[in-house]
Amino acid sequence: MCKIKENFIHLFFMREIRKERSLIMSKKLVAFFSASGTTKKAAEMIAEAAKADLFEIEPKIPYTNADLDWMDKKSRSSVEMSYKKYRPEMIEKEMDMSTYDEIILGFPIWWYVAPTIINTFLEAYDFSGKKIVLFATSGGSGFGNTVKELQLSAPDAVITEGRLLNGANKQKISEWVKSL
């Protein structure tokens, strides 16, 4: 009886040690694009809660308020979003994605999808075999076809819809990160 109990305790502790090792070895990256600063605030809280590295996706030409005027069909964002194959240039940054197991990717929702600069980011690096969890901020629309459209830019990654984080506080973000 004691030998069975000893084996059970040994197996239990070995399983717990493996869990801890996988958590330690699992490296996360929070990558984000933020035109107005709202998504950036959420990304910083997520990175802190997840103990993850932070990577800002920056356009070579920053967006102005006029560029973001979705009511103007000739504004930069309206034009970009009407042509799905458009890829805005981003500031190039050296980044070895092979060091990350999980990418938490954030952006504002534009026209029910991610801004096309997110496609630029996904096509610029190799995300083969990576888990990509999305988060977004939005003035009213949800994820829509976001996962489907982004999957085309990273076909060998596993992309999942995460959460809309409109007005989320540190506690809510921390709870969400723990659930990942």
Put a short name on every predicted segment.
Residues 107-108:
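Glycine-rich, N-terminal phosphate-binding loop of Rossmann-like dinucleotide-binding domains
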Residues 111-112, 140:
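Acidic catalytic loop of the alpha/beta-hydrolase fold
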Residues 133-169:
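Short, glycine-/small-residue-rich phosphate/pyrophosphate-handling segment
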Residues 50-52, 130, 157:
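A structural micro-motif
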Residues 97-98, 123-129, 153-154:
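Short, conserved loop/helix-junction motifs that constitute active-site signature segments
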Residues 10, 15-102, 112-114, 119, ...:
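N-terminal beta1-alpha1-beta2 submodule of the flavodoxin-like/Rossmannoid cofactor-binding fold
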